[in-house]
Amino acid sequence: MKLIELLFILLPLLLWPLTFIVLNTIFIYAMLVSVIILAIISLRIYGREIKWSNNSIIKAITIGIIGALILYLLFYIGYYATILLGIQKGVSNVYTMIYGNAPTLILMPTLALIGICEEIYWRGALQVYVKKKSRFFKKIPWVAGAMYYGLIHLSTLNIVLFAAAVIVGIVTSIIAYKYGILSSIITHVVWIEAIVIFFPIGA
């Protein structure tokens, strides 16, 4: 395995604890830098192999918006599950960390860019890597991508954030695998803007 491929796979193991724990007071900016680094490496290694879209732009957008609506509904239901389980404080902690010192005018484009870069790495390049390197997950690379995305969020020490990552990972990974990451990017960006800026749940 080449050094750059090793870096490509292992870097989130460093960046996620650094972003969510060490630099949580400037979380949104640290997250932006982290995912930009991952996206640059992804495009450098697998940019030509990433499945961007296999549909018309209208269909890609439609699929992306439907995916965002599904995600938002799942999170709406999930919030009430956290209340029943008595862990809803984990939700407010996530919002507090996201809002931080970032004004809305900065937060909106920053969240969009984070969503784009995350999809390039987690649902784009990572699925390419899994298809090329894994025998077990070769035909279901979205499963490996969703698993890694969920598990990496255990490092945040927030069970709600871990559960949220599992849901986001599964939905966007399936969309990217079937329709391309243009649709999963739209899903991610529309959903995150809705749940953080326009229609927050449990903030």
Predicted stretch roles:
Residues 1-47:
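Alpha-helical transmembrane segments in multi-pass membrane proteins
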Residues 49-114:
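Juxtamembrane helix-loop-helix connectors linking adjacent transmembrane helices
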Residues 27-31, 89-97, 162-170:
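Non-cytosolic membrane-interface motifs at loop->transmembrane helix junctions
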Residues 39, 43, 47, 75-78, ...:
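Alpha-helical transmembrane segments of polytopic integral membrane proteins
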